[in-house]
Amino acid sequence: VLIVGERLNTTRKSVAAMVEALDGAAVRREALRQIEAGAHYVDVNAGTFRTREPELLRWMVESAQAVESAQAEEESAPIPLCIDSPNPVAIRAALEVHRGQAMVNSITGEAERLSRLLPVIRDHRSAVVALCLDDAGLPATADEATAKGLRLVETLLAAGIPPGDIYVDPVVRPVGADPGAAVTAIETIRLLRERLPEVHFICGLSNVSFGLPARSLANRGFAAMAMAAGLDAAILDPLDAPLMSALLAAEAVLGRDRHCGRYLRAYRQGKLT
């Protein structure tokens, strides 16, 4: 499972304080913590700053990818970041300073958003999270979500985005508000995986448990079922050790971990919990 660490988001008070104070070292430390915990990308979001979002999102990217010396830059690859914003201006500003391939979170089938974001994504050769959402709004059923997802992926492919750079998001909603939300998302992944075997499938894992107690437990249950349907990436808190352990276990059970190698290595390192 490809992990996108979700913690560098200014909706969290501690992160908002880092950004307000322009504490680049703190941003860098938070990004590194997530990579060390198993994240492959680190999500960066400055959306709560609204009018200052473009400049601050750009600054967050520079801070998270900062290196201490020219030698360090040569010896280590930059932390890959997931640029999280609905604002095309902010996304472009962040991509202009990002080193390596970024991921953009997210694009939809909404005509205006698609027309403004697609050239930016294509020009910077970014990976992209593609939401099963269009001008008609959120899908009510798995079949509707599948149709929206197929149309959006076809548009991305026609624009030259490689299938391996596309991460389809079924748009997971809280089961506390809609008891069928998780089932709909899982079925959407299954249906789209059959039609689009070369693209990836991702979701914001914690969305499913919003409003519930013991959220990590609900997240773990949903993750295993979604992975069985074809989910191969997730936006989550990599410092949630029980959740990360559950993902390793699910990969082993689903035959995605050759000879259970990653699971056994994590056990020997004392990381399973």
Q: Where is each model-derived feature located?
A:
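Short, small-residue-enriched loops and turns at beta-alpha junctions
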Residues: 15, 46-53, 81, 88-89, ...
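A cross-domain feature marking catalytic cores of carbohydrate-active enzymes
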Residues: 6-8, 44-46, 83-85, 106-108, ...
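Structural preference for beta-strand elements that scaffold enzyme active sites
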Residues: 1-3, 40-43, 78-82, 101-104, ...
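Glycine-rich, proline-tolerant flexible connector loops at the mouths of alpha/beta enzymes
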Residues: 35-68, 75-82, 170-182
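Active-site mouth loops of central-metabolism enzymes
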Residues: 3-29, 105-109, 135-144, 208-216
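Active-site cofactor/substrate anionic-group-binding motifs, chiefly glycine-
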Residues: 25-26, 59-68, 73-111
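Catalytic alpha/beta core domains of metabolic enzymes, predominantly
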Residues: 116, 123-271
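Short, acidic/polar
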Residues: 23-34, 113, 149, 218-223
